[in-house]
Amino acid sequence: MSNGTRDVKEVGLSRRNLLKLTAAGLLGGAAITLFPHLRPAHSAATATDSTKVLVIYYSYTGNTRSIAEMIREKTGGDVFEIETVKEYPADRPGTTKEAKRELETSELPALKKSPPDMSSYDLIFVGSPVWWYTVSTPVMRFLTQADFAGKRVSAFCTHEGGVGKFFPHFKEQAKNAVVLDGLELYKPRQAEEGEVNKALDLWLSKLRAEKIEMKGVQ
């Protein structure tokens, strides 16, 4: 990669790319680019119906946290924040270097809390920044500890330089999960809030449709 720092930090969204938000189809490996300003918005109230939702996330700068909170507001779900025992450097180059070391040595960071009890949830979201074109190491550590036990799981990520192998790596590491379509958000902090809302509503509506289809084959 040409610049590790760009992939560790979570940043905003450029007007030049006007909300380059992508829903990545994990089951079939396809990617669908969403331009929410060209699509009708969907009601958040119809996104999950009575589905009980849990939103799990790790955030370095606050970008992923802001998206997690938006998902919580739209779904009425519970939130669980992944926190590391150690503190990463405040400067992004320092965190870039540490993340690279963790990936190269497989020394994933210790977490403050064990995974929550997920047995009562119908749909679980897991959010992460993209670090070195893959899942951030704190979320990797969480995935080594979590057993989704057949739960429906959807990942979302924030980045400014490409997702790389984020989604296939997430699918490989999410043990016993039924992995649904995920969402990548390119530079979300510079996007207009309405555009991000539309993208999230469209994604949630798609997940709701998948739930109906899954019920139909049971």
Enumerate the language-model features and the residues they cover.
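A short beta-strand-loop structural module common to alpha/beta enzyme folds
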Residues: 77-89
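N-terminal secretory signal peptides
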Residues: 1-13
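N-terminal export signals
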Residues: 17-38
